[in-house]
Amino acid sequence: QVRPFLDVYQRSACQARETLVSILQEYPDEISDIFRPSCVAVLRCSGCCTDESLKCTPVGKHTVDMQIMRVNPRTQSSKMEVMKFTEHTACECRPRRKQGEPDGPKEKPR
């Protein structure tokens, strides 16, 4: 069965989609512990833009709190804790930055 063009086009468009992200990718400084689950489902922008010079980019974000189990492999102790993850709420096709171009204002280190 052939999927109609409009369906194919709409499904591939730039939009927030459920995406699995690794907790260690989001929290790289927490490598000494094990997390269960090791990844979480969050909404992130992805999809195709009408032009190769454009990139699917988040224009709206919010934070979600998720309950995760943290396991300390040295002591074999575990505890439930709330961790924060960024979800994308709105996406747009925006011009890609040229290599070497600054990313914009940098956050000040804490």
UniProtKB/Swiss-Prot annotation:
GO BP annotations, alphabetical order: induction of positive chemotaxis; positive regulation of angiogenesis; positive regulation of endothelial cell proliferation; positive regulation of mast cell chemotaxis; response to hypoxia; sprouting angiogenesis; vascular endothelial growth factor receptor signaling pathway; vascular endothelial growth factor signaling pathway
Subcellular location: Secreted
Keyword field contains Endoplasmic reticulum: no
Subcellular location, principal: secreted
Recorded GO CC terms: extracellular space; membrane
A Pfam family annotated for this UniProt entry: PDGF
Alphabetical list of InterPro entries matching this protein: Cystine-knot_cytokine, PD_growth_factor_CS, PDGF/VEGF_dom, PDGF/VEGF_growth_factor
Gene3D superfamilies: Cystine-knot cytokines (2.10.90.10)
Protein family according to the UniProt entry: Belongs to the PDGF/VEGF growth factor family. Snake venom VEGF subfamily.
Protein's UniProt name: Snake venom vascular endothelial growth factor toxin
Species annotation: Daboia palaestinae
Native organism taxonomy: Eukaryota, Metazoa, Chordata, Craniata, Vertebrata
